[in-house]
């Protein structure tokens, strides 16, 4: 008796268009994974070992190793053989620096940051909003001893920073609520604001006095006072701030420091061709 032979249906070869689509999908995935690695490395100056980097990114060790090899060949990452750790490379800094250069007001702002530093004797910062986070573009360091600050290029939640609250005060309550929905209200310290109602009260106060205060909400022991720099449409272009230890930014100094920051921000607004918004009665 003849045995029935079950023949498997021949698989039709993929068209060139399908091959191209598969190649594109694979390429996009690799780019996303490589960028995740760079972003993770940028979070910690101490660097990461391969296994830790795989855990942080949720990728397999072999995938991370393969992508690191490519990134290292292009100098986007570098390997410290002494500690067996990976770090952000020089090329990442070069590419990232174009962000600050594109915001071509950074160089013009430096003399005003120096003035702010000299008037307050504290570190002066220039920051902008990027994707609903605060990014520090440049700063003029205080001559006083300072604890750690947000590093240049570092990102911090808008609700947890003086600069962020200064900018949020120019937004409608609906827009602020949307940002809270997107990013939450992280508790970074025991003094962080984690209730929307409390934040809205603070923003109303910021609108009245023209400057915002971060009172150890991002880092214990540090205070920050910030005011907005406006563009030619009276919209927030950036913000400047002074940061210092609570032992120096005392309650007695806050009002005077707030006035100085607000006035220098207004001067920088005019210098950049911006227009201060009309003060509502």
Regions found by a protein language model. Name each.
Residues 175-178, 182-184, 265-281:
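Cysteine/selenocysteine-centered motifs that mediate thiol-based redox chemistry or coordinate metal-sulfur cofactors
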Residues 27-31, 50, 85, 89, ...:
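Short, structured helix-loop boundary elements
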Residues 195-267, 281:
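Extended hydrophobic
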Residues 2-17, 145-218:
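Short, solvent-exposed recognition segments
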Residues 2-107, 114, 266, 270-274:
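N-terminal helix-turn-helix
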Residues 77-79, 126-127, 229:
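A structural signal for short hydrophobic beta-strand segments in well-ordered beta-sheet cores
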Residues 82-183:
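Amphipathic alpha-helical effector-binding/dimerization core
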């Amino acid at each position: 008796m003849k045995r029935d032979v079950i023949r498997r249906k021949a698989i039709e070869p993929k068209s060139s268009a399908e091959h191209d689509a598969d190649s594109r999908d694979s390429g996009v995935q690799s780019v996303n994974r490589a960028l995740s690695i760079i972003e993770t490395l940028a979070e910690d100056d101490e660097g990461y070992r391969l296994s830790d980097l795989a855990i942080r990114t949720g990728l397999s060790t072999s995938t991370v190793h393969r992508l690191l090899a490519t990134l290292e060949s292009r100098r986007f990452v570098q390997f410290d053989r002494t500690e067996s750790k990976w770090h952000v490379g020089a090329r990442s800094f070069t590419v990232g620096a174009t962000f600050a250069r594109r915001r071509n007001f950074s160089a013009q702002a430096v003399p005003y940051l120096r003035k702010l530093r000299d008037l307050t004797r504290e570190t002066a910062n220039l920051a902008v909003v990027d994707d609903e986070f605060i990014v520090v573009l440049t700063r003029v360091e205080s001559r006083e001893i300072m604890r750690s600050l947000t590093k240049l290029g570092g990102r911090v939640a808008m609700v947890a920073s003086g600069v962020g609250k200064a900018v949020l005060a120019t937004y409608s309550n609906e827009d602020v609520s949307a940002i809270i929905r997107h990013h939450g209200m992280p508790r970074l310290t025991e003094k962080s604001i984690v209730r929307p109602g409390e934040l809205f009260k603070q923003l109303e106060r910021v609108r009245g006095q023209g400057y915002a205060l971060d009172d150890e909400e991002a880092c214990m022991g540090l205070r920050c006072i910030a005011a907005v720099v406006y563009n030619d449409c009276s919209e927030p272009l950036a913000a400047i701030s002074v940061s210092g230890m609570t032992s120096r930014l005392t309650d007695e100094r806050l009002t005077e420091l707030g006035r100085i920051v607000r006035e220098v921000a207004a001067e920088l607004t005019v210098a950049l061709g911006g227009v201060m918004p009309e003060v509502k009665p």
